[in-house]
Amino acid sequence: MDKAVIYIHGKGGNAEEAIHYKPFFSNCDVIGLDYTAQFPWEAKEEFPLLFNSIYRNYKTVEVIANSIGAYFAINALSNQQIEKAYFISPVVDMERLIADMMIWANVTEDELKEKKEIQTTFGETLSWDYLCYARENPIIWEIPTHILYGEKDNLTAYGTIFEFVQRTNSTLSIMKNGEHWFHTDEQMKFLDEWIIKSLSLIHISEPTRRS
């Protein structure tokens, strides 16, 4: 086949999840990205190598990315030859997300700077290095993208996703009462229908490119 679709899973996911998307891309090879990176600076090193090992065997490549997998893709693959992207509940503003988590955990920036890492009661580890990286590496994304967002996403506010959509000329589909994690039968049905709909859409205009 001439085209590959690379699936990039989110936290706690795995490359095998790519199997779900194969029926929608019958004319493509759907490949799960089997990565080990846990931080964006690790993804910055690992993702281009994995991507290029796949891309060299195809004429075109598209990407499906989930949650933090989308953030890693934006951070690490923005300069790659990707024809189109499909983002599911993407994390598009890591600095904002970390700041929100600091509020939830009642942690000040000075405390985080001093301790470097703080374990929260909700299972996440706040990292000073992570916050600094997010600030020092603002995302730039110019690849035609379709985004699926749950109305009740607890990690990314609507205003944040809307700003990203406007800035990148992406399309946005919102599931009423949808969550960050699409996993129920109803949510997966909505996701599948979104994929089908997105496949029929064509970006008429190119995303605004920075000089």
Predicted features and spans:
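Short, surface-exposed "cap/lid" segments of acyl-processing enzymes
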Residues: 1-38
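Short hydrophobic segments within beta-strands
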Residues: 6-11, 64, 88, 148
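Short, surface-exposed alpha-helical segments at coil->helix boundaries
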Residues: 15-22, 41-44, 158-162
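Catalytic nucleophile-loop/oxyanion-hole region of alpha/beta-hydrolase
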Residues: 32-55
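Gly/Ala-rich beta-loop-alpha elbow adjacent to hydrolase catalytic centers
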Residues: 64-73
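Aromatic pocket-lining residues of Rossmann-like dinucleotide-binding sites
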Residues: 76-77
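The alpha/beta-hydrolase serine catalytic core
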Residues: 82-201
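Single conserved hydrophobic/aromatic residue that forms the stacking wall/gate
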Residues: 202-211
